[in-house]
Amino acid sequence: LLAAEAFGIALDRVMFSEPATAMIADGGSTVALRGTLMGGQAILSAANKIKQRMADAVRETLKAQSIDDIAWQNGNVFNRHNPELSLSFQQVCDMTRATGANLSAYGWHVAPNIHWDEEKGCGSPYFTWVYGCQLADVAVDMRTGKITVNNVVATHDVGKVINPVGFSGQVYGGVLQGMIGYGMLEDFNTEHGVVKSENFDTYLLPTIKDMPHIDIIAVENYDKAGPMGAKVIGEPVLELGAAALNNAVSFAIDRPNRTLPLTLEQVRLGYNLKKPERQSEQMLESGDKKQVHRLNTLSLSVPQTLKEALTLMAEKGAMPIAGGTDVLVQARMLSGEVPLVNIAGLAELKEIFDVEGGVSIGSGVCFTDLVKHPLIQQRYPPLATACKTVGSLQLRNRATIGGNIVNAAPCADSMPPLIIYDAEVELRSARGTRRMPVSEFVVGGYRTLLEPDELVVRFILPAPTQQPLINRYLQLGRRNALNITRQSLTGQFMVDKGVVRLCRLVDGALMAKPQRLTEVEQALTGKTLDAATIDYAAGVLHDKVEKAIGGRWSAPYKVPVFIDMFRQMLQEVMTEQKK
């Protein structure tokens, strides 16, 4: 870009061989962008040598007294005082070459002298400085500790902005990494000097969905030490974000904070919680106690029919694979051979159709197709809402509802709505077919009643009641995409003249498995929905949750936050039924 600007030619006419950053001397206040400051000056040095040779060759033709009288713009070289005297850049190159002048040159840049006394801690260690200021506008949910960044203003003095798109990109990336990543998500876990964060299921990086709106302001103070007056932009953006976020959150919650990242727990409790060492979220491990980076132990069978798939599943050790979003991750934890049966192409597992007013959902239906299906949207809105929160668009295009239930993670997003609708699961093997409620099929975290030779073929949801229901689904997660649900609450209510006639509640990512909160339902059913009833039901819920998970490492956060989510849901229902 600097060479193109110097010669006044289009960028596509410049060929650039990018060196390793380490080959370029440190540029001072930024390191990774030293190429702009140090390398840029060297490029201009070489370009000016060549331009002088060109000027000597065409000076008489352009009637120029010196190189200062010559302009280089838009692929032309002309007399700046008499623009009609003009040559194309190619003509200038040809005329210069005809004189025998060399059209190549080395450029050099020697940084100005600096002084730094390490012993006294004084001096000026850099020959140029960048300045910046960032402001964060945030909203904090005091019930959950969830931070929403509404807007960011990033003002940076970078000298002359050479590449506006590149400058903006550096600011966007720096704010996302510094403010959202370092400031909110990247919880690096060490114990006794040993790193426990082994993978990206615990060390969370921000996604594009977490990018806030950013107003970018470039302050262009010309700097004589930089190429064309430019400074640099890079690390300085990163360094401001977390501090701006922390100050904003501290003002919002009226409490100073001196610990990063500002996790949900840190904001809500005032201290962070560390999960005990474990191998992965899937709770799978091999004797090697590690994850492998390459899967070279897989063998894949591709049946053409469901009958053929069931025959293959009868073989010892066979595992089905559809979307692969869980199975492939789990396979990295295993050191032995993993024989897979690919059921992704079986059409009979991808059907959604009406069953006596209810619906049948094939186990191979991906979440994208499930969410957009009109039968699901019209009859079972909480299921559609919950499944929209699964992973990311790419994952929803692959992940299947069958895999989500068979994996049986406590945080499985599709499970609570299926339970609240009394859904049944149909299992099939070469031996026969059986059905059972989803609530009974999952017996605990990552544990089901599925036999080794069985496949989940479909889920059957009964016809929904024709009476008007108030449906609610509340979900809490750390990120806006690629998110593992921290906890959720699914609710169905029928309220008549202020009295709760029907109530169904299912937790998510709270206890060992999602389940109906029957004691709480009983505390609400038949009662007038008012503040006193909510307080009483919240007390019943607190006792149940405390008994179930009170001894866990996460209980100091999960218990009060879940109670607050419950109160929020009932307040919303009470408000809606009054309309």
Language-model features: locations:
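Residue-level marker for well-ordered alpha-helical positions
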Residues: 1, 52, 243-244, 307, ...
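C-terminal catalytic domains of large/alpha subunits in multi-subunit enzymes
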Residues: 2-291, 532
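C-terminal structural segment of proteins
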Residues: 252, 257, 268-579
